Amino acid sequence: MRPPLREGTWLCVKLQFVPQWSNLKRYYFATMEGLTDCIYRRTHHAYFPGIHSYYMPFLSPTVHRQLTSRESRELPPADSVPFRTVPQLLTKVPEDFLWAAQQCRDRGYDEVNLNVGCPSGTVVSKGKGSGMLADLEQLDRFLDAVFAAAPLAVSVKTRLGIADPEEFPRLLEVFNRYPIKELTVHPRVRKQFYDGDVYLDSFCYCQENSRNPVCYNGNIRTLSELNAFEKEFPQVEAVMMGRGLIGNPGMLTGTDAATLEAFHNALLEEYLVVFGGSRNAMFRMKENWRYMLRLFEGSEKLGKRLRKTTDLAEYRGIVSEIFHTLPLSRELRADW
């Protein structure tokens, strides 16, 4: 349970009042493919510290036993990163998982996360991600082989099943057979993707019946939603968030337009160097703006101009206008 607020622990920001509490809970930043790369993680931590662990874009090991250049870049030595990161593995082959886990250990990581929750059609069609939930006997064999030889701690991220939340009790029986460091549950089924309501009754079942520590993930997009969840589930010690933190990078710490602008500009400059030009750098930044624009009131007109521009100077001008003329909303409009 969050302790009582001490005197002076409310931070006033532009049109926001954000509580700053003693962080007894653990807050994780979920991976978002194409957004939360090593540059984003490093820059976010510099401007908005307080995240317990950042989860990396998943590695997909193959029989070739070789990391791609992108994967190597995303997996630097753990002691070279000034915050905690967790590599995420996406595979249905135990031997490939164990090889990749050893690569992570060799680089100094103390945990890897098995992703059996990704609902992407291209992933599921290969029997990976949430596709592994379709055959519990095969999943059991996979986990048995992995935990018999894993060189470091293994956590798991899962959904409730493929099509029906009633699949989850049998799935949890499988997970309960293994010493999973932490079971992150996104209480939707695969066919929902990210639409529709989450099944909180199934998450309650998990809380009551899991033999392993449990982390919650799903539909925590604003500080109000986080506070409401923690009030209903005070015993949950870890929460993973994704789109909400992309949309409001300072959701946990509080922020103002000046800090957001500095964060944005630092990201942009890094991407201009890495991508070697403005086109791809602006494309990456526009992906961030897809969520972050919802933090500003009356952003429709400037947002339309932002999406259309292909000129870096014009892009910079529009962004400056957003930060200097549009007020921050009291809370992110999570209407995606």
Whereabouts are the PLM-identified features?
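Alpha/beta catalytic cores of nucleotide-metabolism and tRNA/nucleoside-modifying enzymes
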Residues: 13-23, 27-28, 33, 38-39, ...
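Glycine-rich, positively charged N-terminal anion/phosphate-binding segment
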Residues: 14-21, 32-103
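Hydrophobic faces of well-ordered beta-strands that scaffold small-molecule active sites
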Residues: 27-30, 54-56, 85-89, 112, ...
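Active-site beta-loop-alpha junctions enriched in small/polar residues
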Residues: 32-34, 59-61, 90-92, 117-119, ...
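Alpha/beta enzyme core
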Residues: 101-112, 116-121, 126, 137-212
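Short glycine-enriched, charge-decorated loop/helix-capping segments at active-site entrances
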Residues: 127-133, 255
